[in-house]
Amino acid sequence: MKILVTGFDPFGGDKINPAIEAVKRLPDEINGAEIIKLEIPTVFNKSAEVVKEAIEKENPDYVLNVGQAGGRFGLTPERVAININDGRIPDNEGYQPLGEPIHEDGETAYFTQLPIKAEAKAIRDAGLPASISNTAGTYVCNHIMYQVQYMRDKEFPNIKAGFIHIPFLPEQVVNRPNTPSMALDDIVKGLTAALGAIVERDGKGDIKAVEGANH
């Protein structure tokens, strides 16, 4: 089994992005699965081109995109990606779409194929906070999650794909009072646990567990 794991470069004025820093530190193998690590740009459209090239080269069984969600307390596997680009800030090349569809011929939304409840449980079993998220936002994180699902729908039907958001690092919140953060080693630990759950649930589907939200 082969899992492609991607992490974004820094954006929005930060000099570091915990996504790529954590991805770079993942083991090369988890529960027998080969882990392929890839840095991608925080740029609409170009990020998808980079991931597509890697899918064509590596032919992975799974794709897990990792992104920073500043303000969240724990690791949050994402349930769904929506067909909208709506940038709160410009991307790293200055592009700021305001409410535009990602693909005119794409579905309104795509659900992940990953066992997100098993991922969340595995992260918590590792001693770290985790919960299911039902919105990946409308920036490049949602964009890449949607783009990979679109690729799966149109070109790569055998892959399973999803996204997980991670918190800020402590050094990112020095001037952001009352903002949660997580140590890089813990983020790596949580991602490793999530990837282990993906491998363990291969061919079995997700677990049954209470992970719903009221709002």
Swiss-Prot record:
Cross-referenced CDD domains: Peptidase_C15 (cd00501)
Catalytic machinery residues: 78, 141, 165
Name under which the protein is recorded: Pyrrolidone-carboxylate peptidase
GO biological process, one term: proteolysis
MF term (GO), any: pyroglutamyl-peptidase activity
Principal subcellular localization: cytoplasm
Classification via InterPro entries: Peptidase_C15, Peptidase_C15-like, Peptidase_C15-like_sf, PGP-I_bact-type, PGPEP1_Cys_AS, PGPEP1_Glu_AS
Enzyme category, top tier: hydrolase
